[in-house]
Every structure is written in structure tokens, then in C-alpha cells.
């Protein structure tokens, strides 16, 4: 995730010319017709053509406004985004800023699209609506100069000075930039270890997990590269040639890729199968070590845990980047279950258990009065009390505009926060319990009051040291148990076809599965459940899907749900088991 401009400006090293005040592009309702290009005609589709590069991506035009998913803006155009107020967003691209309140966010199948016409046209992007893929065109910018310097703080900054704004695509550790560069400039980039290559007007650079920032006056693209992650290091072994995989396959690991039919369409099904009691791989949750807010690439999540194989995990809010479901690690709830949705729970070296899961929690005062807790370390907000711990991150900042709370340490209330005092954030130390009240609920306690926490899981799997939530639950004990309404999913979600990620079991082996449509959108949940039962599975849990669907094998993302390596919140990984003493 790109750093906020204010933070970047504080980093030492190459000075950044202080940018002028950001331009603010008007929202659709604020636009004035004089001088504007002709309104776009109504339509929708599944493909974009970005400076000639064809990319599968959902789009919609309504009332002259182009709506694009957040993943497309970030991964295919280079737009930065950050939270703004309660459920709002701020989009920023080469000095233009667009504020998008929650009312301006919509649903496009399983994507979150936002209005983009003003932002794109403010920087010269031509939008042409015609039959077939929707073209987005921005003339390639000239690369004027390259500057580089070690920053301290474990970063090296590379600044690309440009003659104009440029499109920026990202994925699998590389950036593709719509810029024109000279052979001498490419040699300079090679010296910096960025492995430049120029193809059809796109300059490709290997940047690893670099943070990026676009600026105006003058036009610049800033890359902060983590030191120690050398972009030009030897390429990771390809899956088919990785000796680690070959050794594990000899011990029973299976990797399959096949075309199957379901619901009248062909599906590309990738599966990983193993007996965790025999194959020396451990199933682990994958998450960001910095806390529960934020997204990462699946490849990055896998690498930091040294997972040889990984799939994307549970649901999250793409706007505020917070978790929406259960995730438990080493007996700690990093994020609690919601809506009695499906989950798996497991211990090392065993097959997971599958069930629907909820937590029943309450706090009790010295007079034995109890107050129910609605959620634990969750981005799913509702009226009532919620609790947060240091597993949420080093700080908690109010998610809604009306919150108050108390910090409990050692069973005693230490500090009270009135309405509004959580907006700027409060620290969370190890052992702290922050109880937050929302939606008019009250926290009646004062410093010194004694409180105790009571917690009970609705299913034995909630007592397992490791839990991953998703939903809906598809199969249990050999039966199709799909009941999306009981798990809080909408009818539209249940009926749509989409790429899928599933974790399952045939009673002997663990299965990690992705399903994609060959020439269609993908299977419905019912089609997924039926197909997996036909393949011999007895238990199966649907995880986050759509553009989130991904499979990483040996540091290579071999499956991308809609053709883009989308950022995700968490995942499931298979990590080589360490040999005993």
C-alpha cells in the first residue's frame, strides 16, 4: 500500500518539491456541462483496453459516468486510495484528488466500483465507448530523468521525472509504465537493479514490494524500494521445476489442473491435495504482521511466511481494508467470526473441521451484570459493544463516527474515551482490552471498575488453535449444506457466477481449490458444491472469490481470478514443516 504523501515527505534523502494544493475533481453531481467532452453512452462489459493492453475487468457506464472497480484503479492505472471519513474514500492520481463518499460507491457483482470519469479526464485519459473492450488511452509520457538515493529507514528511493502523467500497471512484483525511455535511461535503470524491458510502449520494471506515489508540478513517480529485497535477485524457481515441490510430490503432494463441466459451462479447476499427517507441510493462516488494516498481494503474504503454496482466504472490506470474518492464529482471535458463517478449524498435522461458527461473548462487572459483545477485532460494525486487542494492530482508530470506549488492563478499567475521542486513534498494548460502543450504545464504566470477559464458541472448531472463516459452507459430512441466507449472504451473491476459492477435504486429504470459467463468469455456489461433491469431497467451505481468487505456487501466482493479481487481506498457506531436533 502506498504511503500517505505527508509521511513520504518526512522521509530523508531525495527532496520532493512540495506539491501545490491538490486539485479536487468534482463528483458526478457537481459537474458543469460547458467545456466537457460528450457524455458517455450507457453500457457495461468485462474487458478494458488500456493503451492497447487488453485486460479482463468489469466496467459500467450509467448516466454518462464510468464506474470502475477499485482493483482496476489501483492495479491497472496507478491510482492511490486511502480512507476518508466513515466509509468514504480519497482517490489520488498525479495531483488530482477525488473524494468518494459511501453514497458514491456501488456494487458490481462482487466488486466495489466508484465514479472515475472526472479523475481520468482531469489527467487527459480518453474514454471511448464502442462495441467490445472499453478503450482507455493516455499518450505515453517521456521519461526526463532518474534519481536514486538510499533513504535510511530500510528504503531506497527512486524518482522518475516525467513530462506528463502516465498509466501504471502493477502485478507479480513488476510495474508496467506507459512511458518513453532512451537506451541510456534503460541502462541506468538496469544499474539500479530494476531489470527494465520495453514492449509495445510499456516500460516494465521489477520493483518487488515497492511503495509508489505519483506527484504533480512537476510530474513524478516515486518508488520506495525496501532494502534487502533486491529486485534483480535471481528469479524464483518456476513451479514445475522447483526441487522442493518435486520432493513433496514424491511424498504424496498432488497438483492438478483440469477442465471440468458444470452448469453448461467449462471450468478451469486447479487443486492442491495432500494428507497433512503424511506430507511435511503445515496449513497456516497468512496475514499482515502490522495488523488487521491493509491489503497485500497473495504472493507477498506467502513469501513472508515462507509458504510454498497459498490461496486467498476470507472476506474483507475493500474500502477500509478491514477483515470481515474469522481468523485465529495460535489460539488468538486476530479477527472474530461474524453472522454464524462457515469456517474451518485445525491443529497442526490434522485435517480441518468444517462448521458454521459464532462467538458468544459478554463482559461482567462486579455486580454480576452482563453486557453482550457483538464482535471481536472485526471490521463488521453494528450497534452495541465490540472488543479489540493488540492483535488488531498497535492502534485502534474509530471505524464509525459515533464511538466511545474503555481500555481494560488486568481486569480493571484504566481509561475512558468519550464520543469522538477515538477518532484520532488510541494505542493498544499487549494485554489491553478495548471495549468500543457504537450506534448509541453506552459504556457505563469508569476507571477503577472491575470487568471480566466471558467467551464461548458455538462449535468445537472455534477452540482449535487455527481458524479461517469464509462462507457459505458448501459441504459437510458428504451432504450439500449450502444455505447462504442463514449466513447473511444476499440473493444476488448466491445466484451469480464468479471465480471461486474453496478449502475442502475428502476425508483423507486436504484440498485447496480454485475454479474459473473458461469462457464464462465462473460457477455459482450451487454449481461449485455439486461439482466438488462429484469430485469426492465430503467437506467444503467457500472462501472469498471473484477478483480475490488466487493460487501461488513456488512464489509464482498461477491463478488470478479475473486476470489481475488483486490485493487481498489474508490467505491460507502450506509451509514446509521444520524437522524436529
Q: What would you call each of these model-derived segments?
A:
Residues 10-56, 61, 65, 75-103, ...:
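Gly/Ser/Thr/Pro-rich low-complexity, intrinsically disordered segments
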Residues 1-11:
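Sec-dependent N-terminal signal peptides
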Amino acid at each position: 500500500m502506498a504511503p500517505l504523501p505527508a509521511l513520504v515527505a518526512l522521509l530523508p534523502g531525495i527532496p520532493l518539491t512540495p506539491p501545490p494544493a491538490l486539485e479536487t475533481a468534482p463528483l458526478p453531481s457537481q459537474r458543469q456541462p460547458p467545456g466537457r467532452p460528450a457524455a458517455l453512452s450507457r453500457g457495461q462489459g468485462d474487458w478494458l483496453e488500456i493503451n492497447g493492453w487488453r485486460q479482463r475487468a468489469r466496467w459500467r457506464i450509467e448516466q454518462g459516468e464510468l464506474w470502475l472497480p477499485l482493483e482496476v484503479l489501483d492495479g491497472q492505472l496507478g491510482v492511490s486510495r486511502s480512507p476518508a471519513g466513515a466509509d468514504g474514500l480519497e482517490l489520488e492520481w498525479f495531483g488530482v484528488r477525488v473524494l468518494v463518499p459511501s453514497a458514491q460507491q456501488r456494487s458490481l457483482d462482487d466488486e466495489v466500483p466508484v465514479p472515475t470519469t472526472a479523475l481520468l479526464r482531469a489527467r487527459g485519459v480518453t474514454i471511448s465507448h464502442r462495441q467490445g473492450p472499453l478503450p482507455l488511452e493516455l499518450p505515453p509520457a517521456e521519461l526526463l530523468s532518474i534519481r536514486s538515493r538510499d533513504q535510511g529507514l530500510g528504503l531506497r528511493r527512486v524518482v522518475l521525472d516525467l513530462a506528463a502523467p502516465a498509466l501504471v500497471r502493477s502485478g507479480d512484483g513488476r510495474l508496467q509504465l506507459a512511458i518513453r525511455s532512451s537506451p541510456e535511461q534503460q541502462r541506468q535503470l538496469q544499474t539500479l537493479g530494476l531489470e527494465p524491458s520495453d514492449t509495445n510502449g510499456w516500460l516494465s520494471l521489477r520493483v518487488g514490494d515497492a511503495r509508489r506515489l505519483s506527484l504533480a508540478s512537476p510530474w513524478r513517480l516515486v518508488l520506495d524500494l525496501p532494502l534487502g529485497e533486491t529486485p534483480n535477485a535471481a528469479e524464483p524457481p518456476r513451479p514445475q521445476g522447483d526441487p522442493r515441490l518435486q520432493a513433496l510430490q514424491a511424498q504424496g503432494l498432488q497438483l492438478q489442473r483440469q477442465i471440468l463441466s458444470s452448469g453448461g459451462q467449462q471450468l478451469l479447476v486447479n487443486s492442491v491435495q495432500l494428507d497433512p499427517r503424511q506430507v511435511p507441510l503445515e496449513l497456516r493462516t497468512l496475514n499482515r504482521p502490522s495488523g488487521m488494516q491493509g491489503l497485500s498481494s497473495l504472493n507477498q503474504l506467502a513469501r513472508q511466511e515462507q509458504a510454498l503454496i497459498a490461496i486467498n482466504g476470507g472476506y474483507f472490506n475493500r474500502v477500509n481494508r478491514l477483515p470481515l470474518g474469522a481468523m485465529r492464529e495460535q489460539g488468538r482471535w486476530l479477527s472474530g467470526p461474524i453472522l454464524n458463517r462457515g469456517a474451518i478449524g485445525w491443529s497442526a498435522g490434522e485435517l480441518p473441521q468444517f462448521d458454521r461458527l459464532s462467538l458468544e461473548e459478554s463482559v461482567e462487572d462486579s455486580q454480576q451484570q452482563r453486557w453482550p459483545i457483538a464482535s471481536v477485532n472485526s471490521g463488521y460494525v453494528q450497534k452495541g459493544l465490540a472488543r479489540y486487542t493488540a492483535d488488531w494492530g498497535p492502534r485502534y482508530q474509530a471505524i464509525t463516527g459515533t464511538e466511545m470506549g474503555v481500555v481494560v488492563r488486568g481486569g480493571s478499567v484504566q481509561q475512558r474515551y468519550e464520543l469522538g475521542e477515538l477518532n484520532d486513534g488510541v494505542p493498544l498494548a499487549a494485554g489491553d482490552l478495548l471495549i468500543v460502543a457504537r450506534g448509541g450504545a453506552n459504556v457505563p464504566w469508569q476507571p477503577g471498575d472491575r470487568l471480566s470477559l466471558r467467551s464461548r464458541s458455538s462449535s468445537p472448531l472455534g477452540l482449535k488453535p487455527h481458524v479461517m472463516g469464509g462462507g457459505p459452507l458448501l459441504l459437510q459430512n458428504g451432504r450439500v449444506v449450502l444455505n447462504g441466507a442463514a449466513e447473511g449472504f444476499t440473493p444476488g451473491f448466491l445466484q451469480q457466477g464468479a471465480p471461486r476459492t474453496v478449502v475442502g477435504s475428502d476425508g483423507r486429504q486436504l484440498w485447496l481449490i480454485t475454479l474459473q470459467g473458461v469462457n464464462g463468469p465462473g460457477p455459482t455456489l450451487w454449481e461449485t458444491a455439486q461439482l466438488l461433491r462429484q469430485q469426492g469431497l465430503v467437506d467444503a467451505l467457500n472462501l472469498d472469490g471473484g477478483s480475490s481468487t488466487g493460487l501461488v505456487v513456488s512464489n509464482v501466482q498461477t491463478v488470478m481470478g479475473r486476470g489481475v493479481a488483486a490485493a487481498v487481506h489474508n490467505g491460507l498457506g502450506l509451509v514446509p514443516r521444520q524437522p524436529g531436533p
